[in-house]
Amino acid sequence: MTSADFDIVGQHYSSLRRPDPRIAKIIHAELMDAESIINIGAGTGSYEPPGKTITAVEPSETMIAQRVDKENTTVFCASAENLPFESNSFDAAMAILTIHHWSNWQKGLQEALRVTKSKIILFTWIGMPEKFWLSDYFPEIKYIDKDLFPSLEQLSTVLGDVKVTSVPIPKDCTDGFMCAYWSRPTSYLDSRIRSAISTFSRIPNLEKGITKLKQDLANGKWFEKYGYLQSLHEFDFGYRLVVSDKQFA
């Protein structure tokens, strides 16, 4: 997805893609020792840890315009594949649910390695669980995003040895990415919510799935089949924190 695409689908990111504090805690723990951090594909600035010197890189002017001004933060309109910085400029790099939007993820990671002295933190996704109910209504999600996100094995070909941590998604997740509303099915009927989830912009014949979901919620079929999910507090939907550290080498 290009910066021009995000100038359209990213219009409500700041209100709908608010960082979830439980996910933030996991990300920030890995960045604790870094003083200077580059946030690649920074979007509106979600998950940037406080108290650090942040350099945010984002190609979309629409996303940049939604950022809240923060102390010790500098924003550059640039792409992951061509970072305008000298080698070893930053202690660490972070890239949060962004790598699938890069035009060349291998080059983007090579650039991250070049400008970073130590850690690279990726929050990414490794594929849809077989039993996630959303694929009943939008079967395309099983492969649309999976073809865009590199696998852990592919990431390792560029990053070398990595540490991988599962990140379960809370039932009341405040960051409105694709699986965030797994326990709140009516949310997917809201076009504004869908507008902040890039996956939906790539699904053909979207209204067919919306209509079926609306019907199943109205007649109780969804609750008969999946109502048990609403008693769970969190669920693993394939989101992972991947950490590359030059000290691993």
Question: Model segments located where?
Answer:
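Local beta-strand N-terminus motif with an aromatic residue
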Residues: 34, 90-91
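Short catalytic micro-motifs in class I SAM-dependent methyltransferases
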Residues: 97-101
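Conserved Class I S-adenosyl-L-methionine
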Residues: 163-249
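Class I SAM-dependent methyltransferase SAM/SAH-binding core
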Residues: 38-82
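A conserved beta-strand element that flanks and buttresses the S-adenosyl-L-methionine
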Residues: 94
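A short glycine-rich, Lys/Arg-flanked "PGG" loop and its adjoining helix->strand segment in the class I
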Residues: 106-120
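Conserved class I S-adenosyl-L-methionine
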Residues: 1-35, 46, 63-66, 119-152, 175, 179, 183, ...
